[in-house]
C-alpha cells in the first residue's frame, strides 16, 4: 500500500467545510485495541477539528500518531494516520470561531483514501455554493 502526502495538497487551496451533520470519527493509538468514538463537523483536505468540551482530557498527546477512521457518509469510511495539531480551550480567542476542541492533521494517507476525501470535500463545497446561489 502506497502512502504519501501528495503535491496536490500543497498546490490546492486548503478548503475547509463546516458541515450541518456531524461525521463519525473513530480514533486509536497505532496497534492499540482501545478506540474512541468522536464527531467532527469541520474538515479540510489536510485534517479536521473535533468538538471537544474539555480538550485537556483528550486521550492523546501532541507526540501521538493516531489511526483514524472518518465516516464521510454511510458506506464510505476512509482511513489515515493523524497527529494533534493544536488545542483550542474554551477561554481561547479561537474558541469564539470554532468552539473548544482539537485540530487533527493528516500525516499519512494512501492515494485511494485521499482521492475519496478530496472528492467528498469538493462535492460538499459545490453543494454549499449551490445552496447559497439558490437563496440569493
Predicted regions: what they are:
Residues 1-56, 118-136:
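N-terminal helix initiation/capping motif
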Residues 22-28, 61-78:
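Short conserved beta-strand and strand-loop elements enriched in small hydrophobics
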Residues 37-38, 80-87:
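Short beta-strand-centered aromatic/proline hotspots
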Residues 49-52, 88-106:
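Short, solvent-exposed secondary-structure boundary/capping segments
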Residues 57-60, 112-115:
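Short, conserved charged micro-motifs
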Residues 107-108, 114, 118:
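Well-ordered alpha/beta subsegment
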Amino acid at each position: 500500500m502506497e502512502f504519501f502526502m501528495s503535491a496536490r495538497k500543497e498546490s490546492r487551496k486548503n478548503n475547509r467545510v463546516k458541515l450541518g451533520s456531524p461525521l463519525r470519527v473513530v480514533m486509536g493509538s497505532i496497534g492499540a485495541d482501545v478506540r474512541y468514538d468522536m464527531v467532527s463537523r469541520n474538515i479540510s483536505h489536510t485534517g479536521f477539528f473535533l468538538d471537544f468540551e474539555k480538550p485537556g482530557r483528550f486521550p492523546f498527546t501532541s507526540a501521538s500518531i493516531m489511526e483514524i477512521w472518518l465516516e464521510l457518509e454511510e458506506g464510505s469510511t476512509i482511513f489515515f494516520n493523524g497527529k494533534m495539531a493544536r488545542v483550542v480551550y474554551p477561554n481561547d480567542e479561537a474558541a469564539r470561531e470554532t468552539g473548544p476542541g482539537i485540530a487533527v492533521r493528516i500525516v499519512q494517507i494512501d492515494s485511494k483514501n485521499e482521492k475519496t476525501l478530496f472528492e467528498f470535500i469538493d462535492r460538499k463545497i459545490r453543494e454549499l455554493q449551490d445552496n447559497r446561489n439558490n437563496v440569493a
